Curated annotation (Swiss-Prot):
Alphabetized SUPFAM superfamilies for the sequence: Family A G protein-coupled receptor-like
Pfam families attached to this UniProt entry: 7tm_1 (PF00001)
Gene name linked to the record: P2ry6
Single GO BP term: positive regulation of inositol trisphosphate biosynthetic process
Organism for this UniProt entry: Mus musculus (Mouse)
Entry-listed glycosylation sites: N5, N173
Protein's UniProt name: P2Y purinoceptor 6
Presence of the UniProt keyword Ribonucleoprotein in the record: no
Membrane topology value: Multi-pass membrane protein
């Protein structure tokens, strides 16, 4: 809910509109979204360009990472509208269709990132815990592209109702763009919002934790293969586990906890406006964490992929050497 509202609360019903003091959104969301745009846009473009340049040697993890970067790029391209909106004191001048599209992109990126990170983690789990099994190697990159197609279809199906519930409205003689739904639809939105959290976050999160618990047990076993190659493999898997867990903890967990609490409170009859405002502020205050995911994902890519991490350094060395030769 993205607005300072009027002051109507029917007895025995959830508060439909309350006066919110939300100056913090202009002070918090505008600079955070600006940083995500300025940093995340070029980073994700670089990730996409590097993966496409290496398309002949793509691994399945790289295919998932490419789709992850595409989701982040689409979201970053929608940020200028939100930055303008919050910089003008939460006034939305772009129309109802743009409002619905921007809200859809946010949640599509959010849940797409969760699912693609889960795919990357599961791929890592198979390589560590079932390295000799052939059943998961069939199909190669083609199978990975099929999985990505299924993920995109699932994300679209999950998040499409967001574009239905999101809408513009008039508050205090200005047009606003509701994030979840107009206040009058709060009880109708609740089942969908809870289902989206369970299916789009909780279940993938549990699957990811299960994968990494199994991987940790396997990597800590003393009877595993020895040698520098095996040690590097263990180290790489450990880095991936720590970084992905950090991404989930920073980007997704606070947002979904506060969102779930806010959805429950705003649909509860008899809740006072000050209480609702407190939960709304907590929810909206964690939204930047979810947006920063578009910056953390490409950093995760460079942190865990040594081959791609060397490419910018090698390119810089070649350009420097060429520039020095031209000076001679």
């Amino acid at each position: 809910m993205e607005q300072d509202n009027g002051t109507i609360q029917a007895p025995g019903l959830p508060p439909t509109t309350c006066v919110y003091r939300e100056d913090f959104k202009r002070l918090l969301l505008t600079p955070v979204y600006s940083v995500v745009l300025v940093v995340g846009l070029p980073l994700n473009i670089c990730v996409i360009a590097q993966i496409c340049a290496s398309r002949r040697t793509l691994t399945r993890s790289a295919v998932y990472t490419l789709n992850l970067a595409l989701a982040d790029l689409m979201y970053a391209c929608s940020l200028p509208l939100l930055i303008y909106n919050y910089a003008r004191g939460d006034h939305w001048p772009f129309g109802d269709l743009a409002c619905r599209f921007v809200r859809f992109l946010f949640y599509a990126n959010l849940h797409g990132s969760i699912l693609f990170l889960t795919c990357i983690s599961f791929q890592r789990y198979l390589g560590i815990c079932h390295p000799l099994a052939s059943w998961h190697k069939r199909g190669g990159r083609r199978a990975a592209w099929v999985v990505c197609g299924v993920v995109w279809l699932a994300v679209t199906a999950q998040c499409l109702p967001t574009a239905v519930f999101a809408a513009t409205g008039i508050q205090r003689n200005r047009t606003v763009c509701y994030d979840l739904s107009p206040p009058i639809l709060s009880t109708r939105y609740l089942p969908y919002g809870m289902a989206l959290t369970v299916i789009g976050f909780l279940l993938p999160f549990i699957a990811l934790l299960a994968c990494y618990c199994r991987m940790a047990r396997r990597l800590c076993r003393q009877d595993g293969p020895a040698g520098p190659v095996a040690q590097e493999r263990r180290s790489k898997a450990a880095r991936m586990a720590v970084v992905v867990a950090a991404v989930f903890a920073i980007s997704f967990l606070p947002f979904h906890i506060t969102k779930t609490a806010y959805l429950a409170v705003r649909s509860t009859p008899g809740v006072s406006c000050p209480v609702l405002e407190t939960f709304a502020a907590a929810y909206k205050g964690t939204r930047p964490f979810a947006s920063v995911n578009s910056v953390l994902d490409p950093i995760l890519f460079y942190f865990t992929q040594q081959k791609f991490r060397r490419q910018p350094h090698d390119l810089l060395q070649r350009l420097t050497a060429k520039w020095q030769r031209q000076r001679v």
